[in-house]
C-alpha cells in the first residue's frame, strides 16, 4: 500500500477536525482548554501579554456539566439485555465482565462510548479478536481467546468509504484509522472486506515527506464485513458525522470565558491605574508609595494617572 493512500484524509474529516478538537478541549477544560487559545487576541497585544491573560482567566466548564448530566440520566438505571440462547455462555460472560481486555465491563465501555458520542456527535466501536493457533473452542475458552471492542473517536478515523448494497442499505467497505501516533511515525490500520492490515508510516504528519510505509501485519477478514459500528449521538446530514451536544454550548462557554477575561482586565486596571511620568521622576508601585519629582519640573510634565471609568 502506497504512502499517499495511508496518509489520505476524507474531505468530511478535514471539514470537521477543527470542531472535534474544539469540542473535546471544551469538555476537558483546564490546560487543554487554555492551550487551545480561545481568548480573542487584542490588537497589538504581545504573545507574552496574551499568555499572561490566558493564565489569569478561569474556565467555567459548562460543557462537562452538560455531558455528565445527560450521561447520569441515561445510565441511572442499568440496561437490561436478553441474550437468548447465549445466556450463560462462558465467552459471553467473560466479554460482559471485561469487554475491552482492559478490565472494564461492557456497561462501563458503552458508557464511555455514549459520552464520546455526546462530545463529538459520533463515536466508533471496532470489534476484534486476537490471532491464535488454537484449533478448538475448548482451547479458546482455556486461553480466554475471544472478541473484544475498542473505542475510536472521530479524530482517529481518518478515511472511510460507504457503498450501497442491492437491498438499498449502505455498508462500509473501507475504513482507515490511526491507532497510535508520535513525532516520528504512526501506526495505521486498514480494514477492508477481504483483509485487515496494519502499517507503520514514518513522518505521518508531514504532508510532503518521503517516509517509508511498512506493512507490519496483514490477516484475512474471516467475516467478510468491516467489524466497526458508528454510534451516533444525533444523526447529521452527512454520513458518518453526527451532531454534538456541545455544538452550541461550547461557543457559549467560549463567550463566557472571554467575558471573564474582560472583567478581570477591568477590575485589575480600575484598582491599579497606570502612572504617566517622565523618565527622571522616581516612583514606586504599591499603596502609600512616594513619588519624587525634580524641583524645577515644569507643571505640564508632572505625573498623572490614567484610569478607566468602569462605566459600561
Short names for language-model regions:
Residues 27-28, 34, 82, 86, ...:
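Intrinsically disordered, low-complexity segments enriched in small/polar residues
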Amino acid at each position: 500500500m502506497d504512502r499517499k493512500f495511508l496518509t489520505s484524509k476524507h474531505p468530511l474529516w478535514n471539514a470537521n477536525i477543527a470542531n472535534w478538537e474544539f469540542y473535546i478541549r471544551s469538555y476537558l477544560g483546564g490546560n487543554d482548554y487554555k492551550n487551545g487559545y480561545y481568548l480573542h487576541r487584542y490588537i497589538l497585544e504581545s504573545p507574552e501579554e496574551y499568555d499572561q491573560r490566558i493564565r489569569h482567566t478561569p474556565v467555567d466548564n459548562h460543557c462537562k456539566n452538560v455531558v455528565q448530566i445527560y450521561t447520569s440520566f441515561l445510565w441511572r438505571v442499568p440496561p437490561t439485555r436478553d441474550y437468548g440462547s447465549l445466556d450463560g455462555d462462558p465467552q459471553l460472560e467473560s466479554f460482559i465482565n471485561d469487554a475491552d481486555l482492559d478490565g472494564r465491563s461492557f456497561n462501563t465501555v458503552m458508557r464511555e462510548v455514549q459520552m464520546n458520542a455526546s462530545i463529538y456527535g459520533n463515536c466508533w466501536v471496532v470489534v476484534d479478536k486476537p490471532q491464535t493457533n488454537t484449533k478448538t473452542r475448548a482451547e479458546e475458552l482455556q486461553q480466554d481467546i475471544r472478541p473484544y471492542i475498542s473505542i475510536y473517536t472521530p479524530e482517529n478515523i481518518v478515511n472511510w468509504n460507504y457503498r450501497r448494497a442491492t437491498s438499498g442499505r449502505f455498508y462500509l467497505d473501507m475504513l482507515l484509522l490511526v491507532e497510535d501516533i508520535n513525532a516520528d511515525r504512526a501506526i495505521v490500520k486498514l480494514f477492508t472486506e477481504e483483509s485487515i492490515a496494519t502499517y507503520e508510516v514514518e513522518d505521518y504528519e508531514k504532508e510532503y515527506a518521503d517516509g517509508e510505509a511498512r506493512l507490519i501485519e496483514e490477516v484475512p477478514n474471516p467475516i467478510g464485513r468491516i467489524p466497526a459500528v458508528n454510534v451516533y449521538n444525533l444523526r447529521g446530514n452527512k454520513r458518518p458525522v453526527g451532531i454534538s451536544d456541545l455544538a452550541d454550548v461550547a461557543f457559549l462557554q467560549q463567550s463566557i470565558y472571554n467575558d471573564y477575561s474582560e472583567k478581570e482586565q477591568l477590575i485589575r486596571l480600575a484598582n491599579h491605574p497606570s502612572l504617566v511620568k517622565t523618565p527622571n521622576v522616581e516612583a514606586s508601585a504599591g499603596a502609600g508609595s512616594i513619588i519624587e519629582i525634580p524641583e524645577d519640573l515644569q507643571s505640564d510634565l508632572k505625573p498623572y494617572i490614567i484610569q478607566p471609568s468602569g462605566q459600561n
